Amino acid sequence: MKRSEFYFDLPEELIAQEPLEDRASSRLMILDRRTGEIKHDIFKNITKYLKEGDCLVLNDTKVIPARLIGQREDSGGKVELLLLRRTSMNEWEVLVKPGKRAKVGKRVVFGNGELVAEIIDTTEAGGRIARFYYDGVFEEVLDRLGEMPVPPYIKKKLKDKNRYQTVYAKYEGSAAAPTAGLHFTEELLDEIRNMGVKTVFITLHVGLGTFRPVKEEIIENHKMHEEFYIVTEEAAKAINEARKNGGRIIAVGTTSTRTLETVADESGYIHPKSGWTDIFIYPGYKFKAIDGMITNFHLPESTLIMMVSAFAGKENIMRAYKVAIENKYRFFSFGDAMLII
């Protein structure tokens, strides 16, 4: 299958540059994947499309302020570090800009010297391994010195760090938000629970690989990035019970979908597990775990539009995106939402 089959022309003004004041006031497109029928609504009305016994699966990862701006210890030159994933207690895989001078042994100083990174190794993907030196708790130092690593297509500076977190974010480790969850408020989640819908939390730490473009024209040749996930016994049991009782399993976001499809067996039974997943879902994939998906509108030719095309059918998705553009839906991380059922 060709990458170009997932291309569409998106007017730049439809790329949402900041979140709406009220999370749940985003627009919601409802797509019936069997008939291709499209409806339009507002996210806070999502309860109209849920039923008692359904199970919403949400990703409770928390974005860390993973973008650090510092100076080279030897020359004072500006350096940007992006934390990708922790490899041990004080060591992280990082991206460095400019990368050419980030040789092993070089040190970068942040703030008033309260955080120092030493480059100790290189990675196959062109990144670096950095060892950090600091006093106190790393997360607290990072919170003071780091910035939220918003995606490259968002040009505006984020006014409030919390707007790039879901209201239920709990476990730190992501370099990007699971954006489908940004539409939920505490009040809406309570309303959903009160109607007899289960909410179950799993964890997948989103890596920046989620924004990595597909360079291969034949998509089957694309190598997917790895992300760390955790599905607890409690979560697996709740999801399996909901399915056994006839409820629909609705994944909130592509990250929850990736996780569930990784831990499900052929019958759709969810196993409690943790580990790294590099699952790449594109048309032809047979879904085992989910009956519905809540997701944002994704980039052309991205692995994410390939995943939703696998779930809803490529023709349905490309037509729905055409309708979204005609109706001026907002796209990408801070944009509007789609419910596929």
Swiss-Prot record:
E.C. number: 2.4.99.17
Keywords carried by this UniProt record: Cytoplasm, Queuosine biosynthesis, S-adenosyl-L-methionine, Transferase
Pathway: tRNA modification; tRNA-queuosine biosynthesis
Gene3D superfamilies xref list: QueA-like (3.40.1780.10)
Pfam families: Queuosine_synth
Keyword Phosphoprotein included in the entry's annotation: no
One Gene Ontology cellular component annotation held by this UniProt entry: cytoplasm
Keyword S-adenosyl-L-methionine carried by entry: yes
Chief location category: cytoplasm
GO biological process, any: tRNA wobble guanine modification
Localization terms from the record: Cytoplasm
Family: Belongs to the QueA family.
Assembly and interaction partners: Monomer.
NCBIfam families the record matches: PRK00147.1, queA
Role, per record: Transfers and isomerizes the ribose moiety from AdoMet to the 7-aminomethyl group of 7-deazaguanine (preQ1-tRNA) to give epoxyqueuosine (oQ-tRNA).
Protein name, UniProt field: S-adenosylmethionine:tRNA ribosyltransferase-isomerase
Organism: Caldanaerobacter subterraneus subsp. tengcongensis (strain DSM 15242 / JCM 11007 / NBRC 100824 / MB4) (Thermoanaerobacter tengcongensis)
Lineage: Bacteria, Bacillati, Bacillota, Clostridia, Thermoanaerobacterales
Name of encoding gene: queA
